[in-house]
């Protein structure tokens, strides 16, 4: 049996995607619509307080295209905290006008493919802690997609030796390093949590960088032979103080 990669796991992650039911929302009187938007704003401003205590983080983006209108991404120390957030969100009046289109449950993950040998406790390493328990950037754009490592009769990632996988992941990582300063990447593991094995969340102030890195990695052996991908979601940041304009209907 091939040796399994060890992982370091950080905050639990929940991506929630919604489409706005504009037709129904249009029937709501303006004063009532303003009230439910204000309630939504207050909810998200309250959940965002974890950032200052370094006990979680969140991001809100307006998704481009018809897959969704809004992405709410929450990071928390415990899975049950994500349940609480989702349950409380569903009780908001605005939730009656937001149609769930997709969700993804995972946990911030670092693998040991590229790690050197050390007796140090990795969870005490400041660099590693910053990656496992991150402060999310307020970049203009976000890109999210789920992925698997292929396992079929021809190409099976899980039948490769540890040394083979380490070599492939090293080459793969070298491409990613070319985009340092342009893209911020977060990998979340989801084996046993969701339908794919990993979620990839990218941040950048230049949306074109998403296309460039994904295209370049198509030629990398790790992706070309072993990568399988779900849907891609791309969007622009939206702040809670922009909600009145976003939900405004003339």
From Swiss-Prot:
InterPro entries per the UniProt record, alphabetical: CHDC (IPR031332), ChdC/CLD (IPR010644), Dimeric_a/b-barrel (IPR011008)
The job of this chain, per UniProt, is described as: Involved in coproporphyrin-dependent heme b biosynthesis. Catalyzes the decarboxylation of Fe-coproporphyrin III (coproheme) to heme b (protoheme IX), the last step of the pathway. The reaction occurs in a stepwise manner with a three-propionate intermediate.
Family to which the UniProt record says this protein belongs: Belongs to the ChdC family. Type 1 subfamily.
Listed as disulfide-bonded, the cysteine pairs are none
Q: Which cofactor does it need?
A: Fe-coproporphyrin III
Q: Which residues form a coiled coil?
A: none
Active-site residues, record numbering mapped to chain: 145
- Which GO biological process annotations does it have? heme B biosynthetic process
| Biological or metabolic pathway of the protein | Porphyrin-containing compound metabolism; protoheme biosynthesis
Q: Any keyword Heme?
A: yes
User: Which reaction(s) does its UniProt entry say it catalyses?
Assistant: Fe-coproporphyrin III + 2 H2O2 + 2 H(+) = heme b + 2 CO2 + 4 H2O; Fe-coproporphyrin III + H2O2 + H(+) = harderoheme III + CO2 + 2 H2O; harderoheme III + H2O2 + H(+) = heme b + CO2 + 2 H2O
Mind telling me which Gene3D superfamilies this protein's record contains?
Apc35880, domain 1
What high-level taxonomic lineage is stated for the organism? Bacteria, Bacillati, Bacillota, Bacilli, Bacillales
Task: Give the top-rank taxon of the lineage listed in the UniProt record for this protein.
Answer: Bacteria
Q: What is this protein called?
A: Coproheme decarboxylase
Where Fe-coproporphyrin III binds, per the record, is at 131, 145-149, 172, 185
The protein's organism comes out as Staphylococcus aureus (strain MRSA252)
The entry's free-text remark on the cofactor is: Fe-coproporphyrin III acts both as a substrate and a redox cofactor.
User: Which EC class is the enzyme in?
Assistant: oxidoreductase
Enzyme Commission (EC) number: 1.3.98.5
Does the record carry Oxidoreductase as a key word?
yes
GO MF annotation terms: heme binding; metal ion binding; oxidoreductase activity, acting on the CH-CH group of donors, oxygen as acceptor; peroxidase activity
Keywords attached to this Swiss-Prot or TrEMBL record, sorted alphabetically, are: Heme, Heme biosynthesis, Iron, Metal-binding, Oxidoreductase
A Pfam entry, by short name: Chlor_dismutase
């Amino acid at each position: 049996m091939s040796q399994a990669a060890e992982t370091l796991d950080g905050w639990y992650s929940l991506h929630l995607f919604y489409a706005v039911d504009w037709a129904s929302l249009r029937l709501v009187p303006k004063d009532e619509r303003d009230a439910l938007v204000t309630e939504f704003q207050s909810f998200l401003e309250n959940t965002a307080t974890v950032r200052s205590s370094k006990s979680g983080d969140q991001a809100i983006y307006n998704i481009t295209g018809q897959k969704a209108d809004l992405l709410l991404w929450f990071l928390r120390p415990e899975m049950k905290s994500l349940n609480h957030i989702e349950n409380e969100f569903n009780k908001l009046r605005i939730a009656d006008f937001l149609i769930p289109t997709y969700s993804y449950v995972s946990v911030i993950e670092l693998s040991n493919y590229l790690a050197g040998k050390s007796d140090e406790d990795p969870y005490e390493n400041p660099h590693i802690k910053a990656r496992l328990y991150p402060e999310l950037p307020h970049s203009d754009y976000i890109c999210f997609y789920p992925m698997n490592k292929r396992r079929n009769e021809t190409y099976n990632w899980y039948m490769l030796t540890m040394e083979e996988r380490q070599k492939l992941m090293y080459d793969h990582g070298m491409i990613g390093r070319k985009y340092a300063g342009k893209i911020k990447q977060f990998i979340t593991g989801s084996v046993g949590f969701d339908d794919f094995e990993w979620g990839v969340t990218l941040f950048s102030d230049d949306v074109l960088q998403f296309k460039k890195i994904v295209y370049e990695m198509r030629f990398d052996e790790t992706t070309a032979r072993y990568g399988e991908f779900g849907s891609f979601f791309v969007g622009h940041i939206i702040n809670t103080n922009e909600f009145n304009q976003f939900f405004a209907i003339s």
